[in-house]
């Protein structure tokens, strides 16, 4: 079924928001996590890093976030520098403060920037509404499902209005129906908030549904194997998930992922 087009963030014509050139990472134990990675991320892009375990997807995110330094190569931001306070990060584990309310968990990054609870309240309540957690502001994490905890984590990452959102397999531990709903909501947030997104995943299906571009990585050492443009209009919904176009894009991405895994001597990855 043909998808209705919507306006996307003004992207790709404006050039890369960030570029990795020849980036390598060798850990202290001698393991090479990344080798000569070249990657450009356009402002407004939704890019998935897809690949088997050990291909350096998470390491690349940490380097971009400034949580790890590359052993070699360069990371360049458009304009020469980038305030990393403009980066949001969503991890696989929600990492919520167990004793704090949902409201206070989302307030945390604003609190660390000196924003009072009263001043932050409108932005927090708006973001909780955007992630469908109306009525849960005073709940604590033990009262929430896994999917709801992830919604809190997404709200916390986006409440500061980041320019770049990094996500490290955020939905991997959730059931398929919850993942579908979160994928739908994440795309809605991406369109409305107009941030750039880098999404790490093992799932072919998830990467095709979400992304404007997929970067398939190979392991041992971690490197870019091939980049795929996802030529499908937004918005993407249940009709897109059941369309022949989606099935064809998934087959193509799966074939490239299989080739990448063969390039590093086999290994297993179920595409999820």
Residue spans for each PLM region:
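Short coil-to-helix segment of the ABC ATPase nucleotide-binding domain corresponding to the Q-loop/switch region
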Residues: 100-107
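Helix-to-loop junction immediately C-terminal to a conserved catalytic motif
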Residues: 65
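Conserved signature/switch motifs of ABC ATPase nucleotide-binding domains
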Residues: 139-142, 160
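Conserved ABC ATPase "signature" region
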Residues: 107, 111, 118-136, 188
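Hydrophobic anchor residue at the start of the ABC signature
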Residues: 154
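The feature captures the beta-strand-to-loop junction immediately N-terminal to the Walker
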Residues: 50-52
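Conserved ABC transporter NBD signature motif
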Residues: 73-85
